[in-house]
Amino acid sequence: MNLDSIHRLIEETQIFQMQQSSIKSRGDMVAPASPPRDTCNTCFPLHGLQSHAAHNFCAHSYNTNKWDICEELRLRELEEVKARAAQMEKTMRWWSDCTANWREKWSKVRAERNSAREEGRQLRIKLEMAMKELSTLKKKQSLPPQKEALEAKVTQDLKLPGFVEESCEHTDQFQLSSQMHESIREYLVKRQFSTKEDTNNKEQGVVIDSLKLSEEMKPNLDGVDLFNNGGSGNGETKTGLRLKAINLPLENEVTEISALQVHLDEFQKILWKEREMRTALEKEIERLESALSLWKWKYEELKESKPKNVKEFDILLGQHNDEMQELSGNIKEESKSQNSKDRVICELRAELERLQAENTSEWDKREILEREKQGLERENRRLKIQVKEMEELLDKKNRLSANSQSPDFKMSQIDLQEKNQELLNLQHAYYKLNRQYQANIAELTHANNRVDQNEAEVKKLRLRVEELKQGLNQKEDELDDSLNQIRKLQRSLDEEKERNENLETELRHLQNW
């Protein structure tokens, strides 16, 4: 309950007390103004005045009861509106949390997708480099069969006696071929270290290495061809070479054979290293292919799940917008209903005022009717007395007529007939007044019943007013407590301000020192 509602209750209680005081003063004013009654009907008018005052009091109390009920309805509606507003705030907070969670989730998904794309791009570059290296290795795989053919020919020539002179002639060519193989090995080592550079440098290095290898393989192959041609020419000059080889010393043959054996061992080592490098590169390519397939699968999954997540987000956003529209519509409807209720309350107030005015007019009419009734009762008594007197006179005249019949008797008969006619008219008027009297009595009984009902409602209203007074006292106590707390806080705030000012002054003095 707010301070405004507390002030409203205070004003309502003050108005109610003023109404009660006005009702009491009105009752005190009405009591002495009542006219004197007869001894036979003294109780009835007093009861009518009491019922009139009680009716006025009940009407005012009924008005206050209606006002309290309207206020209670307003308070309940306010509480309902506050509860709905709190619920709407909770839903808004929940939706904001949901949207924040979705944004965080989508930011993570986007970051993962971008990282996956970057890794896929790097893997593609690595795969291209590996494919280029494989192409160069495949080109180099054509060298081992040629080397094996050279080794076979060398072994055959070593067994022949004319090999010494032939070897002397082709040692230079063999040295050239060995130098070419060493240069190939150096290029392979350089290529192996060059894979650690950037992607653009890798592509350029691979192209340059392949060109250099192709250029250097040509003289190597030329040397092999020369060696083969020299070997084929051995068949023609074997006889002359054998004769020359006999004359050469055996020491030169042993040194050359050892040198050739060393070269063969080196070539075998180079081939073994190249095979190991090839197997390692094949394993690396397989691993890269498997990783690439895995990343492709992950990328496809992310690509497939993206529209689903977007649809879910759109659905949730649509639901949120629908709920917001419903809440705004509910708020508008509540405002419209509140306006309509205010209009109904105003109409009811106007109707209540009209009924109060009608009630006062009816009470005035009732007082007038009671006065007329009392006058008619007096007239009825007077007429009854006159009838009795006339009956006595009639009896006397009948006796006189029985004794003597004269013109006076005829005149008395005529007067008697006129009096009888007047008596009939008076009886007819008496019956009419009696009917009106019965109707007024029925109205009075109905009014008394209404007064009893209003008295019960007044008791209820008094209990309600007492409860409201107790609640008002409690709220006033709470208000006083809150005001005391506010004053205490204000005092503590003032003390803190004074302390801060003192500290600032001390700090300024210290700074000045």
UniProtKB/Swiss-Prot annotation:
Gene Ontology process terms (BP): centriole-centriole cohesion
Keyword Lipid metabolism appears in the UniProt entry: no
Cellular compartments annotated: Cytoplasm, Cytoskeleton, Microtubule organizing center, Centrosome, Centriole
Gene Ontology CC annotation, any one: cytoplasm
Region annotation (Disordered) ranges: 493-513
Name of the coding gene: CCDC102B
Effect of substituting residue 404 to A: Substantial decrease in phosphorylation
Organism: Homo sapiens (Human)
Subunit annotation: Interacts (via N-terminus) with centriolar protein CEP250/CNAP1; the interaction results in recruitment of CCDC102B to the proximal ends of centrioles. Interacts (via N-terminus) with CROCC/rootletin and LRRC45. Interacts (via N-terminus) with serine/threonine-protein kinase NEK2; the interaction results in phosphorylation of CCDC102B.
Effect of residue 21 to A: Substantial decrease in phosphorylation
Keywords tagged on the record: Coiled coil, Cytoplasm, Cytoskeleton, Phosphoprotein
Name assigned to this protein: Coiled-coil domain-containing protein 102B
Chain positions found as Phosphoserine: 21-22, 34, 135, 142, 194, 210, 401, 404, 406
Coiled coil, from the record: 72-142, 268-337, 363-513
Function: During interphase, forms fibers at the proximal ends of centrioles to maintain centrosome cohesion. During mitosis, dissociates from the centrosome following phosphorylation to allow centrosome separation. Contributes to CROCC/rootletin filament formation.
Modifications the protein undergoes after translation, according to the UniProt entry: Phosphorylated directly or indirectly by NEK2 during mitosis which causes dissociation of CCDC102B from the centrosome and allows for centrosome separation.
